[in-house]
Amino acid sequence: MSSKTEIPIITDEGDFSAEYETFCQAMNGVADGTFICVSVFGPQSSGKSTLLNDLFGTSFKTMDLSAGRTQTTKGIMARAVDFQTKVAPRVLILDCEGSDSRERNQQEAQNIERHIGCFAAAVSDLLIINVWNHDIGRHSAANYNILSTIFDIYFRSLLKARRKSGNHRPLILLIAIRDAEEDGAELTQRTFESDVHHIYEQSVPKQYHGSFRDYFCLRFWFIPHRRYMKSLYDEKITQLKTDIKEIFDSLLGAETATTLIPLTDSSIYYNNIWDIVRTDKDLDIPSQREIVSNIRCEEFYLEAIEQFSSQVGKVFADVTAAIQVSLGQQSSTFLEQSPDAVKDYPITKLHNACNSFKLTKVLMDLSQECVALYRRKTRHYIPKVVTQWATKLNDDVLAGLKKVAHSFAKGIRESTCQALGAVTAPFRVQITQWLERHEYSDDYASNTNTVDILVPDLISDLTFPQKRLTDLMGLLGAATRVFHKCISVNWAHEYSGLCDTGILVNLPPNDVGPNSNVRIGDNAIETNAGSSVRLSVGYEASEPMVDAHIDDSGAFFSDIRQTGVYSPHLYAFLESLSLSTYGKALSLQKLPAAPPDVANAYDAVCLLHTIILLWYCETMMPLSLIYDITPEIDHVIPESNALFCETMGSILAAVAEAVSSQTRTITASMTQATARLMDDKLYVTLGSLRGVIYESARKTLERSFFSLLSSAFVAPDHQGLLYLQTRLSSPSIYFDLHFDSSSRSSPTDSILPDTQNPVYKQYTDIYLFSTLPALLSPLPRAYNTVGTRLSSGSSSIQSLLPRYRAVPIVAALDMSAFYIPQAALSSFMDRVDAEIIELINKSLGEFFSKSFPLVLQNKIHTKLVYDDQGAQRSYISENSILTEFLSEKKGLISMAQLFEGGTLITENLHSVTIKPTSQEKIDAMLRCAEAEWDKTYQEALEIYRTNKHKDKYKWVWLGLCVFLMLTRKWVYAVLLSKYCLCITILLLSVGLFVYQRTTPDERNASFSIVATSIRERDVGQFWDATKRLAQKVIH
């Protein structure tokens, strides 16, 4: 397909033409829209348009000689013509405006000539430079300036873009020399080539000098005069048509085919290139396919996502409507004996409206159609760009699927909770009333807040109000009666109805194995054994077969077998449970007459909770096993079970918090006391403290919770639940039901190696390895447990642990985890240990910032200035002071460095490295401390010097005193003589004269020098000072 007329790409004003965009849009839908771009430029009126018309049969406007030489082509004109080559089926011809025109010179708009040259060089596969023969050697007339522009833009932008797109061929420059003659053609070619190489060397970076032929290919056409040598001209044109086809096939080659874009996309690329060129920005031109691929892939992405959103919106509306209809129904209680109760069940109606399997298939089909549409329309574009948008499309499609699936799951969850609410209403009323009772709150608060702190026992005792716990035991009994009331024939038939409508899918027991191959179809799940479970849309549940309550456990198991829901493993477990002493007692709502002794109160409580919850699970659990649409559906927790767990959990939390609060108090105070010692064993001591606190808290929690459970569930005379001894001492059920006689290891050894409670292990083994794999089918949503094998009949199969969280069963196992040494205690002690570590780190940090600066000053001041009794210290010499100072300073610096971090190593606990503060803060504190240390050092020196003079002259004074004592008679005689009196009067007169003739500053300075000279026994200094003072007095 070609254009019938010439279309402007760039207008005379320098704008991108809207006509070209319209033409490209009209090319949309062409099977192969690729093309080769050929452009021609040269001086004005050099015959460019005429040459194109003769070569390609176009009709570009040519110059009218009668009107004079004027500008004919303005901007860039284009036309697409069919031209079959090995590379593309058509050629896009660009007729560029002539250079050096009078009109552009008058408009002072010669810059557009450069822009057109840049644009043509950027988009063309073949450049034709049209030049007159007689202009060879002239700079402007021969288009040398255009060649300089081509070389410049090529190495700044085009080379990088061509290499990025995989195009390593040289750019073809076809020089058309007009009005040429055969004579002198060879000389003309050499001259032109020499000029081109010279321009090349001047225009390109130095690293490309001498490599012209690696990047450009020059071809010459010598075309005779069209008017005066008509026949030769026509022959040459015919020859050139063949020549240009060979150029397309050979010189362009296969590399060009991989970089071409559809003609319909060329307007996008050309418009972007023109905007860059016109604004004189630094050209960073990506490959054609890259820029167009990004734009087109975005368009096709939007188209695909719009189609998907529209179709999914309809499905979403249908699902929403079905949910609204379902939730709008009045839910019936399944404790009634109405045969029609199951037909009104909200979940049944919801699945009749939108079956989960069929919904999944519809959504998957819509998503696949969306992706296929995008892939089909983007197959010709760059794979990297296609993948980027495909990833975004995939994310948006998944978001759309999740929106519908979330709505579906929300409807199922709300419907399930609506039905469970009717069943658990009596229990919820009772437990709500129990939780709202406040008569025990004061006693509870007093018992939790008045805890004696003892180290290392940490806490002496922790008790709770006995009335509250006795009341809780009565509430558990009421809950048991509610659960028992829920076991009715209607529940069994409800399971059957749910199975037939697709809510609960359980494969027959023969198909439970790791090799089952499940294929989802429109209305069935088919396995490799040929069996199937019907998933009928709109299927009505069958009528109940029995309408009476269960009077005994045998009738219950007989009726539940008729539903065909549970596996033989579950039948065997339930039957063994019902025949046990406690099972019969629970069924008849009474206790055994002569219960045996019990040795482990924890096991008794664990078994009580587990059996109550398991019995409850057998009636409620199937409602949780809904098809796995979203993760939210894994967390459908029955309200009654949640309240039960929360009640017991709150009691444990209260005990744990009381213990934890004491550990925090002990940790903070003991860490501060340890830090004040400040020795090299700081972190060793803190590690030991951590171990003492940890072990004390552990013992306290065990003792407190043991007291709590035993006082709540076991009578003081050890009667009540003592009949559980039979169950506790009996052989493990899983060995009788599920393992070969040669099996010697428990299946939970590899999964729960730390669990030591036999009851906990017994029920965990049964439910992990027999009941759950049968109940939580279909198999594709399960994973294997390596190294553990179960027996089914005579063949051994690998056990399967499904991805489902059967919340009631998990809650039951969590209740049995009240076996303190392994489950609840371990979890709590991890938190206690974390608090101990955090508080040690925090307390050391606070000690460092608040108390340690005083420690630094007090220690060195005490060490240098005062002794332990508070008296001033005496030293032998100044060197001893310096040695003591440096030694103490080194010790304080080492002490400060301890706060940079250390390891708490505790027996039976993992080692922990803590960092109370940073090295920067330590350095800053030491810098501040050193200034005070220097003052303390100078103070010690001053004290030493003072004491030194005192010690030196004390014997002189003592001798003088003894001498005066011995010669006191002669001293009195001298003092009373007339000579002494004269000398005294003379000295007083001199002193008075000095006082009057000198200033106080002069006297102080002189007397200070005199005193120093006397102290240092410097006679010369003494006489000099005396002489200067006499001179000041005389003058």
From Swiss-Prot:
MF (Gene Ontology): GTP binding; hydrolase activity
Domain GB1/RHD3-type G: residue ranges: 32-267
InterPro entries per UniProt: G_GB1_RHD3_dom, P-loop_NTPase, RHD3/Sey1
Domain of life: Eukaryota
Residues that bind GTP: G42, P43, Q44, S45, S46, G47, K48, S49
E.C. code: 3.6.5.-
Any GO CC annotation of this UniProt entry: endoplasmic reticulum membrane
Xref: PROSITE patterns: G_GB1_RHD3
Keywords of the record: Endoplasmic reticulum, GTP-binding, Hydrolase, Membrane, Nucleotide-binding
Family statement drawn from the similarity comment of this UniProt entry: Belongs to the TRAFAC class dynamin-like GTPase superfamily. GB1/RHD3 GTPase family. RHD3 subfamily.
Biological role: Probable GTP-binding protein that may be involved in cell development.
Name of this chain's protein: Protein SEY1 homolog
Originating species: Giardia intestinalis (strain ATCC 50803 / WB clone C6)
